[in-house]
Amino acid sequence: MMQVLLVTICLAVFPYQGSSIILESGNVNDYEVVYPQKITALPKGAIQQPEQKYEDAIKYEFKVNGKPVVLHLEKNKGLFSEDYSETHYTPDGREITINPPVEDHCYYHGRIQNDADSTASISACNGLKGHFKLQGEMYLIEPLRIPDSEAHAIYKYENIEKEDEAPKMCGVTQTNWESDEPIKASQLNLTPEQRTYLKSKKYVELVIVADYIMFWKYDRSLSTIRTRIYEIVNTLNVIYRFLNIYIALVAVEIWSKGDLINVTSSAYDTLDSFGEWRERDLLNRKRHDNAQLLTGINFNGPSAGRGFVGRMCQPKYSVGIVQDHSKIYLLVASAMAHEMGHNLGMDHDRIDCTCGAKSCIMSGILRCETSYLFSDCSREEHRKYLINKMPQCILNKPLKTDIVSPAVCGNYFVEVGEECDCGSPANCQDRCCDAATCKLRPGAQCGDGVCCYQCKFRRAGTVCRPANGECDVSDLCTGQSAECPTDQFQRNGQPCQNNKGYCYNGTCPIMEKQCISLFGASATVAQDSCFQFNRRGNHYGYCRKENNTKIACAPEDVKCGRLYCLDNSSGHKNPCQIYYIPSDENKGMVDPGTKCGDGMVCSNGKCVDVTIAY
C-alpha cells in the first residue's frame, strides 16, 4: 500500500479576531508585538573575540502571551565545514566556486529558560527570525519592517493563513534495504563492533543544490537563496541532534545558468537524474556524504519530495529531492529532514507510531503542528539500519581545524584549544572531561573514542574495527590516539570466495549472494541465456542510463546490467526472474565490482579487465 507524506491545508484558528499583518510567512492574525532585549551570555571558558560581529552566546528577554521569557542562544558552530564552498554559474556558463568566510555567521540554536523541553532555531542576521518551542507549542518570530524599530512579531504556527492548495505527499512507497534477519530490541546480541557503532556520534556532510526555478523564484538573488538554505540547515541540525547526528553544510550550489540535469515534474525521474549527476559530477568536485536538491518545480500529482531508502553513503543513492513548497522554511526543513530520514533507513510512520507530539518527522502527513521529533518507530528503524549497514561515511569526525570559528566550550565539538567537549556541565556525561574548561581531567589521556577505555588509550594492537569478511582487514588502535584509524580493506581485484569474485571496497560481490538478498535463501543465478534480455534497452534489461534513457548492453556486457535469478521457492516458475519496482528501478542491477568473467568485473555497466578497473 502506498505511503504518502501529505502537506495538509492548515486553516487558521483564532482565539479572537485581531488585525491582520503580512509577514514573510504569509498573512498572519493573532500576533504579538515584542521588543527583544539582548543580554550577552558567554558560556564558561569562552572568550569574546573583538573582531566578531555576532557573539558566540547571547540571550534575549521578551514577552510571550504577556509573560516574560528568556531565550538562550549559542552559535551553531558545526553549521559549516572548513572547506565550505559556494558554486554558481555566470550567464555564459562559467562555473564560479568561492570559499566565503563563514566563521562569524549569525545562526543559532537555543532554548527557553526554565523549560526543559524547549528548543529554538534562530537567525540573528537582521533581528531575530526563526522559531522556538515553548511549553509544547511552536512559535515563530520575525522582525517587523518598521524603520528604526526593534519591534518583532511573535505568532503561533497555526495562525498563518495558508493558500488553498492540494495536499502534498512523499513519493517513497516502501523500504528496500531490509535484511533477512530482524534485529532484536536488546543490545545483548550485538557484536562489539555494532555496539561501538551505535554509540558513536554521526556526522552528515551535506551539499544542497538549488535548481534554476529556485534561482528565478527568489528574483535571481544568490544571497537570498543562500540565506534560505542556511535557515533550513540550521533547523536540520536541531532535528537530527535528537538522533545524535550532526549536519555540517559542506557546499551550496545554485544552478543560476540553467539546470545541470533534466528537472521534470516526475519526482522519480528527477531523483534518479540527480543521483546520477551526483555520482558522475558532484562527488568528483566535492567530498560529501549526502546531497539534497531543493527545487521550485511542482511535481506531478501531490508529490512534494522523494529519497532513496537506506542508501546513505552510496554514490548514486545518498540523495533526496525536496520541493520548496512553502514560504515557511520550517516546513521545508521538516520535509528535507523527512527525505534524509529515508536515506537513513526510516520508513513512513504507521498509525501506532508516536513521538509525544501531534505530528512526527516521518509521519505520512506534514501537519501545521510540526515538531522536531522522530517517532519510536523511526528511531527503531534507524537503529536497525545502522546495525545492518553501518554506513562508514557518517563516522568521519570533523578535525579540530575543520571548525574555524572561535571555540565555544559546551557545544559538543572539540575545537582548537580544547581537549574534549561533553556539552554543558549540566549535560556532560563524560567523567574524563571537565565540562567547565573543556580540558581532560588530571591523569586522563582521552575522553571518548573507540580506542579510549576508562580515560586511557587502549594499547597498540587492540582491534577497534574487526574485519568484516575476507576482503576486509581488522583495524588496530595505535596506542597514541582515542580514534580508530581510517577503515582499511584488502586491495580491490583480489580474488575472493574461492575465485567466485573479486574484492571491491571491502566486500566480495557475487551474483549468487545478490540473488539471495533479493529473493531469499533458495534463489540462484539464472542461466546465461536470461542475461540476453539486457540487450533490449528497456526496464527489463539495460546496462546503464544516460539522461534517463536506458542504454542496451553490448553483447560482452550483458552480465553487468539487470540481474537475472532463478527463484526456487514454491510457486515461482519463471526461470528468468528479475527484481523490479518502479519506485527504484536501479534496485536489482548487478552490483559494481561483480565478477562477469574470468579476470573481468563490472564497472559502470561494462565488463572490463580487473587490472584496468582498479
Swiss-Prot record:
Any Pfam family matching the protein: ADAM_CR
Checking InterPro entries in the record gives: ADAM_Cys-rich, Disintegrin_CS, Disintegrin_dom, Disintegrin_dom_sf, MetalloPept_cat_dom_sf, Peptidase_M12B, Peptidase_M12B_N, Reprolysin_adamalysin
Subcellular location, principal: secreted
Record-listed Pyrrolidone carboxylic acid modification sites = 194
The record's account of how the chain is modified after translation: The N-terminus is blocked.
Q: Which residues bind Ca(2+) 1?
A: 205, 289, 393, 396
UniProt KW keywords: Apoptosis, Calcium, Cell adhesion impairing toxin, Disulfide bond, Fibrinogenolytic toxin, Glycoprotein, Hemostasis impairing toxin, Hydrolase, Metal-binding, Metalloprotease, Protease, Pyrrolidone carboxylic acid, Secreted, Signal, Toxin, Zinc, Zymogen
Please give the residues making up the propeptide in this record: 21-193
- Subunit structure, as described in the record: Heterodimer; disulfide-linked.
Q: Which protein are we looking at?
A: Zinc metalloproteinase-disintegrin-like VLAIP-B
